[in-house]
């Protein structure tokens, strides 16, 4: 698949286009220009490294939303085996914005749950753009309770702009469904490992993000509202989204500094969308480490540690400036 470049990557896009042009010429010519191609590839790599070393929070949010970024189902095929998808909330419907089911992780049974966006227009509509309705969260809840019943770990993958705000979702109890998940996840008697793989938007993300370990991919985001939404509320203009992104502290690095995130999983140069396989390997290693650490805890220790973790949120110290 040809890489789609973001606005701030235009200089990289120009170089890559030139490289592709030279490759095409070399295929149809006896002239050896591999040295020139190699030089440009090296230059493109260095340029990408320089640009990504100083991304702004707004630019990071654009990378987190990249249409070619790997989604939950991509990681399921790259990291897990024997995946068996489970459908429906047993109350209303099967929400396609959330996928989940039983799988094996290095041979060990686990329950995997995650948001799922779409690639093309048809799939985006089918997945409701990754915005779950109440039945999606109730499906996730059903699977988590099933995991607890069988004593297997839960791994969740968060990637949503937020819970669906439609009237039908509100009528079916959107806020109750989210709140119920928070309540139950806080007391699940099995390890829960949460990974923010793209956008972590508001309560729609939080509803499957309460756990023992919270990790974020390097260029993912996690916030109470989108930068555009924040700008529209505070300044009545979505054009100030870059300023809102900076103010809210939505990046993995910022959230780790605040103690809200346990681990940042490095992405390949240029973002996860550049190399799905490499990203999956990095994430698999992070999941292995987290599961190994949690597997050594008794149920009582697991719950006590989780409670202490949740109660630490929101604590901070103020220091007077003389």
Curated annotation (Swiss-Prot):
GO annotation (BP), single: malonyl-CoA biosynthetic process
Nucleotide-binding found in the keyword field: yes
Protein task: Component of the acetyl coenzyme A carboxylase (ACC) complex. First, biotin carboxylase catalyzes the carboxylation of biotin on its carrier protein (BCCP) and then the CO(2) group is transferred by the carboxyltransferase to acetyl-CoA to form malonyl-CoA.
Protein keywords: ATP-binding, Cytoplasm, Fatty acid biosynthesis, Fatty acid metabolism, Lipid biosynthesis, Lipid metabolism, Nucleotide-binding, Transferase
Keyword Coiled coil attached: no
Residues annotated as domain CoA carboxyltransferase C-terminal: 39-293
Gene it is expressed from: accA
Reactions listed under catalytic activity: N(6)-carboxybiotinyl-L-lysyl-[protein] + acetyl-CoA = N(6)-biotinyl-L-lysyl-[protein] + malonyl-CoA
EC number: 2.1.3.15
Protein's cellular compartments: Cytoplasm
Taxonomic lineage of the native organism: Bacteria, Pseudomonadati, Pseudomonadota, Betaproteobacteria, Rhodocyclales
The protein's annotated pathway: Lipid metabolism; malonyl-CoA biosynthesis; malonyl-CoA from acetyl-CoA: step 1/1
Subunit record text: Acetyl-CoA carboxylase is a heterohexamer composed of biotin carboxyl carrier protein (AccB), biotin carboxylase (AccC) and two subunits each of ACCase subunit alpha (AccA) and ACCase subunit beta (AccD).
Family recorded in the similarity comment: Belongs to the AccA family.
Source domain of life: Bacteria
Protein name as annotated: Acetyl-coenzyme A carboxylase carboxyl transferase subunit alpha
Organism: Dechloromonas aromatica (strain RCB)
Gene Ontology CC annotation, any one: acetyl-CoA carboxylase complex
Molecular functions (GO terms): acetyl-CoA carboxylase activity; ATP binding; carboxyl- or carbamoyltransferase activity
Entry-linked InterPro entries: Acetyl_CoA_COase_a_su, ClpP/crotonase-like_dom_sf, COA_CT_C
């Amino acid at each position: 698949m040809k890489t789609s470049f973001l606005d701030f990557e235009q200089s990289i896009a120009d170089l890559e286009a030139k490289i592709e042009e030279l490759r095409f010429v070399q295929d149809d010519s006896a002239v050896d220009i591999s040295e020139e191609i190699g030089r440009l590839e090296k230059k493109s790599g260095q340029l990408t490294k320089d640009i990504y070393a100083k991304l702004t929070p707004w630019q990071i949010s654009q990378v987190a939303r990249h249409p070619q970024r790997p989604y939950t189902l991509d990681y399921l095929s790259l990291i897990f085996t024997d995946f068996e998808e489970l459908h429906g909330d047993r109350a209303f419907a099967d929400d396609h914005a959330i996928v989940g089911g039983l799988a094996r992780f290095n041979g060990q049974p686990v329950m995997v749950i995650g948001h799922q966006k779409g690639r093309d227009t048809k799939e985006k509509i089918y997945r409701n753009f990754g915005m779950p309705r109440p039945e999606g969260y109730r499906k996730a809840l059903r699977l988590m309770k099933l995991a607890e019943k069988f004593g297997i770990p839960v791994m969740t993958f968060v990637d949503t702009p937020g819970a669906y705000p439609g009237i039908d979702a509100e009528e079916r109890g959107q806020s109750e469904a989210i709140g119920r998940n928070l309540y139950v996840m806080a007391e699940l008697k099995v390890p829960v490992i949460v990974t923010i793989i793209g956008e972590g938007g508001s309560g729609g993300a939080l509803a499957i993000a309460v756990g023992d370990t919270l990790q974020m991919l390097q260029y993912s985001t996690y916030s109470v509202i989108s930068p555009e939404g924040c700008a529209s509320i505070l300044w009545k203009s979505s054009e100030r989204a870059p300023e809102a992104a900076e103010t809210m502290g939505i990046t993995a690095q910022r959230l780790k500094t605040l103690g809200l995130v346990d681990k940042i999983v490095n992405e390949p140069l240029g973002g996860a969308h550049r190399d799905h396989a490499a990203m999956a390997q990095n994430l698999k290693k992070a999941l292995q480490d987290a599961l190994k650490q949690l597997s050594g805890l008794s149920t009582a220790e697991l719950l006590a540690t989780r409670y202490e973790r949740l109660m630490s949120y929101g604590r901070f110290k103020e220091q007077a400036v003389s």
